[in-house]
């Protein structure tokens, strides 16, 4: 466990955003007008001088999943805002790897965006091949129960994303064959190997969804990179999802999980299998248990 110093700005104009710095002295590089939009400031070490901000200590591992859970538990929050650091002196903690981190000077622009959700949603990211569809040449749906399960997730205030390492043509053709078009808010394709950084995107006007490839350099030294939340978080912001409660990955490959709040590692499906109820229960149980533990009564968007 690491001990983090948390400075709490109860007068912040915008709630839930977190600025992470290496040390207290780095705050001298941030203008006061910018700090007014930051509710929490986090760093390791002690406060070097007197401050008007309230102070707490948080014990959490230096990894994002544990940090997010313990931070929300300590401050009784149902969700967190964006993570910021200093472009001129970025924080170097492990928890920031593969998470979307903004320069603190971008905050005034970011907080001006209107969110499409009044209550922050849960985000569920699905793999496609051998997760939702079979590995057959003529693909089939894994289990017909998937359709109703996705509808239920929508009713639970979830943003549903699809991330396939297949090319766009494969994704579009497969979704059409198994009639999964229209279920996903964001669809990502390609980007499995380091060096694939096309920035192309194409809008499907019929289903109001964007097919996008993944234009990110990731902090992973591997020929087969995992499904970094940084990519999903970037497109959520583009989709005007400013805040979210949790992010879940549903995938047959355990190596694709990195920093997700929840991971459902299901079995592969070379051919159809009647088992979706098992995996769907795991997804829903996590969401419902979370909403009980972190109720929305604590939700504040702007004050």
Question: Model-found features: residue ranges?
Answer:
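Non-catalytic pre-domain segments flanking phosphatase-related domains
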Residues: 1-126
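A structural signal for short, well-ordered beta-strand segments and their strand-loop junctions
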Residues: 5-7, 20, 125, 161-164, ...
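Asp-based phosphoryl-transfer active-site loop
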Residues: 117-139, 252
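A short acidic (Asp/Glu
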Residues: 135-138, 171-176, 198-201, 256-262
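Well-ordered, non-membrane alpha-helical segments in soluble/globular domains
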Residues: 140-149, 222-234, 276-289
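Substrate-recognition element of Asp-dependent hydrolases with the DxDx(T/V) motif
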Residues: 150-176, 187-193
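Substrate-recognition "cap/lid" segment bordering the active-site pocket of phosphatases
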Residues: 172-245
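Asp-based, Mg2+/Mn2+-dependent phosphohydrolase catalytic module
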Residues: 238-248, 253-303
């Amino acid at each position: 466990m690491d001990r983090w110093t948390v400075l709490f700005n109860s007068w912040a104009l915008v709630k839930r955003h977190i600025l992470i710095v290496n040390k207290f002295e780095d705050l001298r590089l941030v203008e006061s007008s910018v700090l007014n939009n930051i509710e929490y400031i986090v760093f390791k070490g002690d406060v070097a001088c007197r401050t008007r901000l309230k102070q707490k200590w948080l014990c959490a591992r230096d990894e994002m999943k544990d940090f997010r859970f313990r931070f929300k538990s300590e401050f009784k929050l149902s969700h967190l805002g964006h993570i910021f650091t200093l472009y001129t002196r970025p924080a170097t903690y492990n928890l920031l790897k593969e998470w979307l981190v903004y320069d603190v000077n971008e905050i005034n622009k970011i907080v001006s965006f209107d969110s499409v959700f009044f209550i922050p949603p849960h985000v569920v990211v699905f793999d496609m091949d051998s997760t939702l569809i079979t590995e057959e040449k003529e693909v089939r749906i894994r289990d017909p129960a998937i359709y109703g399960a996705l509808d239920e997730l929508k009713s639970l205030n979830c943003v549903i994303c699809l991330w396939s390492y297949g090319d766009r043509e494969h994704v579009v053709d497969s979704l059409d064959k198994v009639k999964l078009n229209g279920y996903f808010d964001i669809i990502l394709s390609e980007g499995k190997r380091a060096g694939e950084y096309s920035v192309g995107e194409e809008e499907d006007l019929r289903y109001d969804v964007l097919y996008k490839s993944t234009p990110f350099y990731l902090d992973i030294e591997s020929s087969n990179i995992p499904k970094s939340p940084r990519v999903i978080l970037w497109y959520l912001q583009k989709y005007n999802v400013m805040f979210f409660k949790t992010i879940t990955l549903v995938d047959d490959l355990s190596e694709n999980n990195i920093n997700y709040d929840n991971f459902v590692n299901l079995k592969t499906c070379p051919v159809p299998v009647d088992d979706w109820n098992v995996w769907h229960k795991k997804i829903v149980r996590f969401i419902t248990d979370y909403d009980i533990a972190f109720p929305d009564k604590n939700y504040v968007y702007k004050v």
